[in-house]
A protein has these predicted regions:
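Phosphopantetheine carrier-protein modules
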Residues: 16-35, 52-62, 80
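Conserved catalytic core of two-component sensor histidine kinases
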Residues: 42
Length: 80
């Protein structure tokens, strides 16, 4: 799962945050901290679907489902 988290961190930093040098910790809050806003949340959902082939339902686009890289990685692994 560590490799998946590293890949997610890099993709989010570059493609969502547009900050290639940004380091995101596995337990860092993405949504509840405001790092990822509602517009970026849709981009994140599309990134996960396109990159990992995992469908994210609209009802799952919230901090309860994937506020951290760890939560997001577990969701992806559970659906692959």
């Amino acid at each position: 799962m560590e490799e998946l988290i590293e890949k997610l961190a890099a993709k989010i930093a570059v493609e969502i945050l547009k900050q290639s040098k940004r380091i995101i910790r596995p337990d860092e809050a993405l949504i509840s901290s405001g790092l990822i806003d509602s517009f970026s949340l849709m981009d994140l959902s599309l990134l996960v679907e396109n990159e990992f082939g995992v469908r994210i339902e609209d009802t799952e686009l919230n901090a309860d489902t994937f506020d951290t890289l760890e939560q997001l990685a577990r969701l992806i692994q559970g659906r692959q």
